[in-house]
Amino acid sequence: MSANTYMQQYKKATVEASGPEETLILLINEAVRSAEASRLEQDAEKRGQLLDKARRIIAELSSSLNMDYGGEVAFNLLRLYIFINRRLADAMGGETDGLTDALRILRHVQETWHRAVEIARESAAAQG
């Protein structure tokens, strides 16, 4: 088996063994990584693939929001995800400001999710 195949199997096993919080963190990290990598990519086709990957991840995060349970927080996240996807689409069209905007918001969302999961773990540990 190639190193790439092993890596794909490792990633799949990691996601399958993760809880929803860890899966969310893995996804948002990968969206940020793909968007950042697209900035450095010289090949237009590969850059487009990286941006498309980030867009698909954000679309998946959007579709997983529970609007009934999440209320205003879920609605605001949906609005952020829509904005990020729009700006990534603009970046696919060659607009460099689109990628800058998308990455700025993506990093903020990433940081917020990391902190939220950390707080939830601390709270769970304190309760027993």
Language-model features, listed with the residues they occupy:
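N-terminal intrinsically disordered, cationic/polar leader segments
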Residues: M1-A37, K46-K53, A59-N66, E72, ...
